[in-house]
Swiss-Prot record:
This is 1,4-dihydroxy-2-naphthoyl-CoA hydrolase. GO terms for biological process: phylloquinone biosynthetic process. The active site is at residue 15. It catalyses: 1,4-dihydroxy-2-naphthoyl-CoA + H2O = 1,4-dihydroxy-2-naphthoate + CoA + H(+). Keywords: Hydrolase. It comes from the Bacteria. Catalyzes the hydrolysis of 1,4-dihydroxy-2-naphthoyl-CoA (DHNA-CoA) to 1,4-dihydroxy-2-naphthoate (DHNA), a reaction involved in phylloquinone (vitamin K1) biosynthesis.
Length: 148
């Protein structure tokens, strides 16, 4: 089952046109990512300040399907998946009520924080990813249908 994160769109999330500023949707998605880690029992303090490893985002994309305004109650549905020994990506779907309003993807690479070289994912992250394995298969099927 995908992880769901509930969020209200705040005034600070919007631009002069009154809709969510394009870069802020990634920030909101990242909040969902952090909530997913926390819910899985991963200490955010240790995860983000661990001096031995880091997980930088090396790719991000967003497709906006409808505008989001201040006060909107959205649900971020996310599914992380392992895509290599040292990387994973997270697929996000942002809903307003039952309407899909945006989709996003972030790709993360595990690196040694000192040498900045790639390293294999930690067991903690592999366990987190394994918790979503069945959902990953459904995401892949949906992506395949979109291409056709």
């Amino acid at each position: 089952m995908p992880f769901t994160y509930h969020r209200t769109i705040n005034f600070q999330d919007t631009d002069a046109a009154g809709v969510v500023y394009f870069a802020n949707i990634l920030s909101i998605c990242h909040e969902g990512y952090e909530a997913s880690l926390r819910t899985s029992g991963i200490s955010l303090k240790e995860f983000f300040t661990n001096p031995s490893m880091a997980f930088p985002i090396v790719h991000a994309s967003v497709d906006f399907l409808r505008p989001l305004f201040c006060g909107a109650q959205v649900i971020i549905s996310l599914v992380p998946q392992k895509i290599g020994a040292e990387k994973f990506e997270i697929n996000y779907e942002i809903y307003l009520a039952d309407v899909l309003v945006a989709k996003a993807v972030t790709r993360h690479v595990c690196i040694d924080a000192n040498t900045r070289s790639k390293q294999e994912l930690s067991m903690e992250i592999i366990q987190w990813l394994d918790g979503y394995r069945k959902d990953t298969e459904e995401v892949e099927r949906r992506k395949a249908r979109e291409v056709v």
